[in-house]
Amino acid sequence: MAASATATVGTKGIVRQVIGPVLDVEFPAGKLPSILNALRIEGKNPAGQDVALTAEVQQLLGDHRVRAVAMSGTDGLVRGMEALDTGAPISVPVGEATLGRIFNVLGEPVDEQGDLKNVTTSPIHRSAPSLTDLETKPKVFETGIKVIDLLAPYRQGGKVGLFGGAGVGKTVLIQELINNIAKEHGGVSVFGGVGERTREGNDLYEEFKESGVINSEDLTKSKVALCFGQMNEPPGARMRVGLSALTMAEHFRDVNKQDVLLFIDNIFRFVQAGSEVSALLGRMPSAVGYQPTLGTDVGELQERITSTLEGSITSIQAVYVPADDLTDPAPATTFAHLDATTVLARALAAKGIYPAVDPLDSTSTMLQPSVVGDEHYRTARAVQSTLQRYKELQDIIAILGLDELSEEDRKTVDRARKIEKFLSQPFFVAEIFTGMSGKYVKLEDTIKGFNMILSGELDQLPEQAFYLVGSIDEVKAKAEKLASEAKA
């Protein structure tokens, strides 16, 4: 593996060709760097401009040349400049020193808080844990979000996909999860911003400072490290920043023996960057223009995200779905690695149901009686069958109206509408837009609430009382308030 390739450390090559973010470098015979080695180019070009960039070797071309992909812009780079072989892959800082800080793909701080002192570094390319080191006993990870905990529970040390098109609330849901995990579980999180908007990254950082997830006074008390390679970065940076974030998370798991949360927003941008790099390297594209190595690229990242006997990395990955098409190769390949999927539906967002998690499309391998228990399993399945029946009846209601339904079906529709409303929930991170305080709902309260709706105990309460509340006690309080307002 490239991590051990130190024989060529310090060898100097000459840049022979630059095409956008891809450069060809010629080295002395017998001194070629290994694939994945980092090359460092520093100096002044003939125009007197300072040039400083790192590139990663991707191909050995023959004629003593290698082809590398730059991790930053190649502006000012000219043929004839010297490139130094570092003899190892890109390495990033790891450990407590990373908490509360923002890094780029190379592990350089970009938050204007100064350089890191006496920090341990680790290469971003490494093998997945061996089979004998893996933890195989399933354990549910409580998030405090009703629709997730009840219908598509997350596995501790598992991989979760957040699927949805543009603007249906993936990033807000990720922010809420980081907030809940930090406050309720005292967990450490690593956030990998892969190819998303710079503004969102800045907003996220400011929100973390406001909520105390990042402690501005004492960074060591922060609960999250951030690693960003945003939309404006070259494809090389967007392709590798996910690995940089993962490397930081692995250190907390393997060395500190902690349970870690790794957020990747957005895993589709990782695939998209790989596709751009693949085309620049001259590889033949496969279906829909994606790279021929799509399965391998995704697999190398995903297989490192796992639970070991020492600790766990639970990963929550936002997956942008191009044109809302779940059969697109990028989301379809990602599906194969996931333990749970949280699918966000535009139709629910249009109705004002937030989080807009689709209760029928979202799935989890954890939702089985042997893992979650009989009561949880029965409640979840009853909720889904009620919602499914409501979905089937919608055409009849649209054509003939509610009055044409049987008494039993009318009851089902009434309860389904209450369930749909009760699956909404105010978020802590959305307080600024909604003016409503966020709610963290314990799993037992969630199960109790839905059982009461299904049993008919709450049939007399108005539908609106179930909208944007936490537990069932809040529903009752809201119903009383609505009744008193109606009288007034």
From Swiss-Prot:
CDD domains on file: ATP-synt_F1_beta_C, ATP-synt_F1_beta_N, F1-ATPase_beta_CD
EC number(s) from the headed UniProt entry: 7.1.2.2
Topological category with respect to the lipid bilayer: Peripheral membrane protein
Catalytic reactions on record: ATP + H2O + 4 H(+)(in) = ADP + phosphate + 5 H(+)(out)
Residues annotated to bind ATP: G164, G165, A166, G167, V168, G169, K170, T171
One GO molecular-function entry: proton-transporting ATP synthase activity, rotational mechanism
HAMAP family: ATP_synth_beta_bact
Quaternary data: F-type ATPases have 2 components, CF(1) - the catalytic core - and CF(0) - the membrane proton channel. CF(1) has five subunits: alpha(3), beta(3), gamma(1), delta(1), epsilon(1). CF(0) has four main subunits: a(1), b(1), b'(1) and c(9-12).
Protein name stated in the entry: ATP synthase subunit beta
UniProt source species: Prochlorococcus marinus (strain NATL1A)
Gene name for this UniProt entry: atpD
